[in-house]
A protein has these predicted regions:
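Acidic, glycine-rich two-metal-ion catalytic cores of nucleic acid-processing enzymes
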Residues: 191, 196-292
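N-terminal leader/targeting and assembly helices and adjacent pre-domain segments
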Residues: 1-192, 283-323
Length: 323
């Protein structure tokens, strides 16, 4: 394999991964903004409700099953209702916002995959494919449809634990809320809340969203290969220090495209391993064209085109680039 061909592939893959990362960052930032807005409003309400509790009600709250059916005092019932509203809003609103960006990604990746693999006659509807993708498990059984419902349920349990624990330790309402929201500190010239439960949850949301978007991209590629007539796929792992041992060990493995035992990437959070269509021996005949950029050709500066547009050997792999 010639060095120019290897470099062309690596540059092309790097450009596309950089684009996907930027697109995912935009989606993540929009979701985190919504997450912060909803959570801050509900925490303010929770703080007000905690201030209204009597000593007897605080003691009752310490041993409360928040999801229980039993009736409590009016003020405790208001706290339960406030938590219901908080986490229902997170589940519904974040899911809706993510779906919009995921459909946009699916449409883009469908067009990109056709262009990348030179299958001009293949037509994949990204929007239609997403309806199947959202109900297809990935990363050990996660479903896109349940992504934010699961995140909200997990966070709710943590918040309930902090309320109980804080009261049992004699913490003030302000201290309890601070454990959830964090402490306001100066960060990078501005102010932000750090060290709280919500900061940790932002990292969870970012990781889960990036993984879900990877699931969308990989699924679209598989649909494209099937439509193009490929019967086999080959594992393509990004081989660097961040690649897990499992993905590195199966790089280059070949599977029937319809094999139910075939790994469904992403198999773990932040997984960058995917598939390429091939024959039963793992080869893709001839040359394949690539235009590895979201911009139109006319909008790409001439000095960048040599890395983004051209022809390369269809059998060049990421693994071979290490040779």
């Amino acid at each position: 394999m010639s060095t120019p061909a290897q470099k062309a592939l690596l540059d092309a893959l790097s450009q596309h991964q950089a684009y996907l990362y930027r697109a995912s960052s935009q989606s993540v930032n929009e979701l985190l903004k919504q997450f912060g807005s909803i959570s801050n409003a509900q925490l303010l309400r929770l703080s007000e409700l905690l201030e209204e509790l009597t000593d007897t009600e605080r003691k009752a709250l310490q041993g409360l099953n928040f999801s229980g059916k039993g009736r409590a005092s009016k003020r405790i019932e208001e706290i339960k209702a406030s938590l219901n509203e908080w986490f229902d809003s997170l589940s519904v609103e974040l899911s809706a916002d993510f779906e919009k960006s995921a459909i946009t990604l699916a449409v883009y990746e469908a067009a990109y995959a056709v262009k990348l693999f030179g299958e001009a006659a293949v037509a994949i509807s990204g929007a239609e494919a997403y309806e199947t993708i959202r109900k297809t498990p990935y990363a050990g059984g996660q479903l896109v449809d349940h992504l934010f419902k699961d995140i909200a349920a997990s966070l709710r349990k943590k918040v309930e634990y902090v309320i109980r624990d804080g009261i049992s330790q004699g913490q003030t309402n302000q201290q309890i809320v601070q454990r959830i929201k964090g402490k306001r500190e100066k960060v990078d010239g501005g102010y932000s809340y750090t060290g709280g439960m919500l900061e940790a949850e932002r990292h969870v949301i970012e990781r889960q969203v990036r993984t879900a978007r990877s699931h969308v991209s990989t699924s679209i590629y598989i649909d494209t290969y099937k439509a193009a007539g490929y019967e086999y796929v080959k594992v393509v792992a990004t081989l660097d220090g961040r690649t897990c041992k499992y993905c590195a060990s199966i790089d280059g493995d070949i599977y029937s495209i319809d094999d139910p035992a075939r790994p469904r990437f992403p198999v773990h959070p932040n997984n960058r391993t995917t598939y390429v269509g091939c024959d039963k021996d793992g080869n893709i005949a001839g040359q394949r064209p690539f235009v590895m950029d979201e911009r139109k050709v006319k909008d790409i500066p001439k000095e960048e085109r040599k890395h983004l547009i051209g022809q390369l050997d269809a059998n060049t792999s990421v693994g071979e680039s290490k040779v």
